Curated annotation (Swiss-Prot):
Keywords: Antibiotic resistance, DNA-binding, Magnesium, Metal-binding, Plasmid, Repressor, Transcription, Transcription regulation
The protein's role, per its UniProt record: TetR is the repressor of the tetracycline resistance element; its N-terminal region forms a helix-turn-helix structure and binds DNA. Binding of tetracycline to TetR reduces the repressor affinity for the tetracycline resistance gene (tetA) promoter operator sites.
Matches recorded under Gene3D superfamilies: Homeodomain-like, Tetracycline Repressor, domain 2
InterPro entries the record matches: DNA-bd_HTH_TetR-type_CS, Homeodomain-like_sf, HTH_TetR, Repressor_TetR_C, Tet_transcr_reg_TetR, Tet_transcr_reg_TetR-rel_C_sf
NCBIfam families membership: PRK13756.1 (NF010319)
Gene: tetR
Protein name: Tetracycline repressor protein class E
Organism ancestry: Bacteria, Pseudomonadati, Pseudomonadota, Gammaproteobacteria, Enterobacterales
One GO term of the biological process aspect: response to antibiotic
Source organism: Escherichia coli
DNA-binding region: 26-45
Binding site for Mg(2+): H100
Pfam families: TetR_C_1, TetR_N
Residue ranges annotated for the HTH tetR-type domain, each copy included: 3-63
GO terms of molecular function: DNA binding; metal ion binding
Positions of tetracycline binding: H64, N82
Length: 211
C-alpha cells in the first residue's frame, strides 16, 4: 500500500467538505474515506481545528491569486483585486467562509501579509490604520460570502407580499440582484471611505505642541 501523503489527506478532506459540509467533516469520516485507522490519520491531523486550518491554507494557496500587491497598482486597486480574489477563493468549496473564520496568517503567509501592510503604509496610512483596513476588507468579504453560502434565503412570496412598500421593493431588488453586484457596491464604498480618511489625514494641519 502506498504511503499516505498530506496532499492525499487534504484532497479527500476537501471532497468530504463539498459533500458533507463543515458539520459533517470529521476526522472519523476522513479516516474511513481514506480507508485507514484514526491513529494513522493523527500523524497528519491531530484534530478537526488543525484540519480546518490546513484546508483553509490549502484553498487560499491554490485559489487566492491576488493576495499580494503588484508593483504597478495603487493601494485602492490592490484592495479591490485582493477582496475579489479572496471572495472567489472562499466560494470554491462548500462552507468556505465558515472554514476560514478564526484563522490567522501562518509563517508561509507572513511575507504576503507584510507586503499588504507595506502597500498601505507607503500610501500614508499608519500600521494601525493599515491593519484595520485589511481587517475591514476581510470581515466584509467573509460576511458577504457567509450570507451567500447560507440556505436561509427569503423565498416565501406571502412574506414579501405582506411587507410595507419600501421593504417590498427592497425584497424585489434583492431577488433580481446578484450577490456579486452587491459585493462590488459594498467594496467600492469601503475603499472610497478609506480614501476619504487618507485625504483628510493628509490635509489636516499638524498642531504645534509648543503653542
Amino acid at each position: 500500500m502506498a504511503r499516505l501523503s498530506l496532499d492525499d489527506v487534504i484532497s479527500m478532506a476537501l471532497t468530504l467538505l463539498d459533500s458533507e459540509g463543515l458539520e459533517g467533516l470529521t476526522t472519523r469520516k476522513l479516516a474511513q474515506s481514506l480507508k485507514i485507522e484514526q491513529p494513522t490519520l493523527y500523524w497528519h491531523v491531530r484534530n478537526k481545528q488543525t484540519l480546518m486550518n490546513m484546508l483553509s491554507e490549502a484553498i487560499l494557496a491554490k485559489h487566492h491569486t491576488r493576495s499580494a500587491p503588484l508593483p504597478t497598482e495603487s493601494w485602492q486597486q490592490f484592495l479591490q483585486e485582493n477582496a475579489l480574489s479572496f471572495r472567489k477563493a472562499l466560494l470554491v468549496h462548500r462552507d468556505g467562509a465558515r472554514l476560514h473564520i478564526g484563522t490567522s496568517p501562518t509563517p508561509p503567509q507572513f511575507e504576503q501579509a507584510e507586503a499588504q501592510l507595506r502597500c498601505l503604509c507607503d500610501a500614508g496610512f499608519s500600521v494601525e490604520e493599515a491593519l484595520f483596513i485589511l481587517q475591514s476588507i476581510s470581515h466584509f468579504t467573509l460576511g458577504a460570502v457567509l450570507e451567500e453560502q447560507a440556505t436561509n434565503q427569503i423565498e416565501n412570496n406571502h412574506v414579501i407580499d405582506a411587507a410595507p412598500p419600501l421593504l417590498q421593493e427592497a425584497f424585489n431588488i434583492q431577488a433580481r440582484t446578484s450577490a456579486e453586484m452587491a459585493f462590488h457596491f459594498g467594496l467600492k464604498s469601503l475603499i472610497f471611505g478609506f480614501s476619504a480618511q487618507l485625504d483628510e489625514k493628509k490635509h489636516t494641519p499638524i498642531e504645534d505642541g509648543n503653542k
